[in-house]
Regions:
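Conserved beta strand-loop-helix elements of the APE1-like EEP
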Residues: 12-28, 121-138, 161-164, 231-233, ...
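Extended active-site neighborhood of metal-dependent phosphoesterases/phosphodiesterases
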Residues: 15-20, 27-30, 244-268, 323-420, ...
Length: 471
């Protein structure tokens, strides 16, 4: 803590005045003399990087308080930052002084809560206020008079404020594309602060539509992880888009306060033409969050014009926290130009482990909202399966918190429907993807007995697996 003091009078061999404690050191400090006929008064003005904070103890005399207010207004008007005023004004809410104060200042504390005398408060003479000229960059989260009757002859006031983040600090990640099926595309990204978000998109950058996520009639907002679906897109058409995030400083039943708005640069994408007979895709697996390996692989494909990317498991392995997951997902999506190229994230056995494993799905928009599924890319049908863990559910290391037997059985039903579907039958080519191969493992594959009879007769052209760390 940093201590600042503005002496007003000599007292008992020392000084008496205004004190200020702050977590950060002020960039500028000033003591301003104020009138007081019974005793001299003072104002301490501390300038910080983003705001000004002033403390004072005004005179008992109305005339002196009015003169002090004029001095305060003059100093406040010289700053462009938010300016806050706190202290003992020696005036009740109905007084002429407070009425004059409120013409230029917005009171942030609750005048209905008495502050004096501390043992049994009957009057409100202490306030926290903000200069109206520059009071747009924050919101009052809470205000209270603390139940402390002993520390001082006045009760302390606590006002919690939330200040607006700068626009260039609002985005935490770049946008990344997900779930490019059904003539649609999902755009995802994260912000550093709770925000109200939308996507602006169109076939050029001058005629833009707006998309938001609306659930049961309400816009999804005041969150940090954002997922917005763009529907009714035309295959083969190039689209431009940018993501927009406006900070939400306050979200209450009858009041919302917004901060600054950040807008990303424009990115572009194109959905595949129905029936196209060729495409390029990149499949990664078992990266195990090895950044150097991933970047080296990206250098090998930097000159390839690929259409989509699949991360076939054990890439965002053992996710311990939201921060850890976000960091490596950003590494992956930015490495493959995920703002322009859609990515599919499939689970391996390691995505299922650790404290944030369940939360990991919030970062993706799975096809059909399942960790398994199927889709068409041109004339090709692509089927993705989720093998779950590589050990039985009753293994001690899972602590009875897994039931992948149910998930594997569920996919038996999915496979039966998929193999009989016209989309699968009419496809010219068929690709199967799953993390753990059905054969060639050191141990027993828990999917083999369930899936083999269905898959061995299915006309897949290629099956791509991972897990074994062997080529």
């Amino acid at each position: 803590m940093y201590a600042c003091f503005a002496p007003a009078i000599d007292y008992d061999g020392g000084k008496y005045g205004i004190g200020l404690l702050s977590k950060k050191a002020p960039v500028h400090l000033q003591t301003i003399a104020l009138p007081g006929r019974e005793e001299a008064r003072a104002l301490i003005l501390a300038e910080f990087e983003d705001y000004i904070y002033c403390c004072t103890h005004l005179s008992l005399t109305e005339e002196d308080r009015m003169k002090s207010l004029e001095i305060l207004k003059t100093f406040a008007a010289s700053y462009k930052k938010p300016l806050f005023l706190a202290g003992d004004m020696n005036a009740e809410p109905e007084s002429d002084f407070i009425k004059e104060l409120q013409k230029e200042f917005r009171i942030l504390s609750n005048p209905r809560q008495h502050t004096f005398p501390a043992p049994a408060p009957k009057e409100t003479i202490d306030y926290v206020a903000a200069f109206k000229q520059n009071d747009k960059g924050f919101a009052v989260v809470s205000s209270e008079v603390v139940n402390e009757p002993v520390a001082s002859d006045h009760r302390p006031i606590v006002v919690e404020l939330r200040t607006a983040e700068k626009a260039d600090k609002i985005f935490r990640t770049k946008p990344y594309l997900q779930n490019p099926v059904g003539n649609g595309m999902t755009v995802m990204w994260e912000t550093t602060v709770p925000a109200y978000c939308w996507v602006e998109y169109g076939t050029d950058t001058t005629q833009l539509k707006r998309a938001r996520t609306i659930v049961d009639g309400q816009v999804v907002c005041n969150n940090k992880l954002h997922k917005i679906r763009l529907d009714d897109l035309q295959p083969g058409q190039k689209y431009y888009y940018r993501v927009c995030s406006q900070e939400m400083l306050l979200y209450q039943a009858y009041k919302k306060v917004f901060g600054n708005t950040a807008r990303s640069a424009f990115s572009e994408f194109t959905l595949p033409v129905t029936g196209t007979d060729s495409f390029s895709a990149v499949v990664f697996n078992d990266l195990h969050q090895h950044t150097h390996t991933f970047r080296a692989l990206c250098r090998q494909i930097q000159d390839i014009d690929y259409d989509f990317v699949v991360f076939n498991g054990d890439c965002v392995d053992d996710p311990a926290s939201h921060d850890q997951a976000t960091a490596f997902i950003s590494e992956l999506t930015e490495g493959v130009r995920g703002d322009c190229i859609p990515t599919f994230f499939m689970r391996g056995n390691h995505e299922i482990r650790n404290a944030y494993s369940i939360g990991l799905r919030d970062h993706f928009d799975y096809v059909g909202d399942k960790t398994y599924g199927s889709f068409n890319w041109g004339d090709t049908r692509i089927v993705m399966l989720d093998c779950g863990e590589d050990k039985t559910d009753d293994h001690w290391v899972y602590y009875d918190l897994n039931d992948f037997t149910q998930l594997r059985n569920e996919q038996v039903g999915f496979l039966k429907k998929e193999l009989a579907a016209k989309e699968f039958k009419k496809a010219k080519k068929r690709i199967l993807l799953h993390h753990i191969p059905l054969y060639g493992n050191d141990g027993k594959n828990l999917c083999t007995e369930l899936w083999t009879k269905l898959l061995e007769k299915a006309p897949f052209d290629i099956c791509l697996n991972a897990h074994t760390h062997k080529y």
